Design a protein with these regions (language model features):
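Non-heme di-metal
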Residues: 1-125
Length: 125
């Protein structure tokens, strides 16, 4: 089958709102965009753990510490699920992490702001 035929079938599925599965044929640019968006979301979940985790020992009460620990664990879980989703599209977790560490991949910039007070942490998280 020619690429033009595959693109037409793909676009027909999109137009009919048929779900595209990871193993389905899709244009390379579409696949790359999905991997970029999913990995950026995964990176944001994992990096988002950092300002929250920094406050676990300084939370104002035991109840808030427990809530914050659960939230940090939840963010980590979200990141792992998203990395797994991106892996189904044909990229490796190692490559996504390498791209993050090299600056090629991004994450939400809100996590670059300092969380100097408990209120700051709540606003960022």
């Amino acid at each position: 089958m020619q690429v033009q035929d595959l693109e037409k079938i793909f676009q027909d599925k999109i137009d009919q709102e048929i779900k595209i599965e990871p193993k389905d044929w899709m244009p390379d640019a579409y696949r790359k965009t999905n991997v970029r968006q999913i990995s950026q979301h995964a990176h944001s979940e994992v990096v988002g753990m950092l300002p929250e985790g920094n406050w676990i020992s300084r939370a104002p009460s035991l109840k808030r510490k427990a809530i914050l620990i659960a939230k940090v664990q939840d963010e980590g879980g979200h990141g792992l699920y998203l990395y797994s989703a991106a892996e189904t599209l044909g990229t490796s977790r190692e490559q996504m992490i390498d791209d993050l560490l090299s600056g090629k991949a991004k994450y939400s910039s809100i996590f670059n702001y300092p969380t100097l007070t408990w209120a700051d942490m709540g606003a960022v998280g």
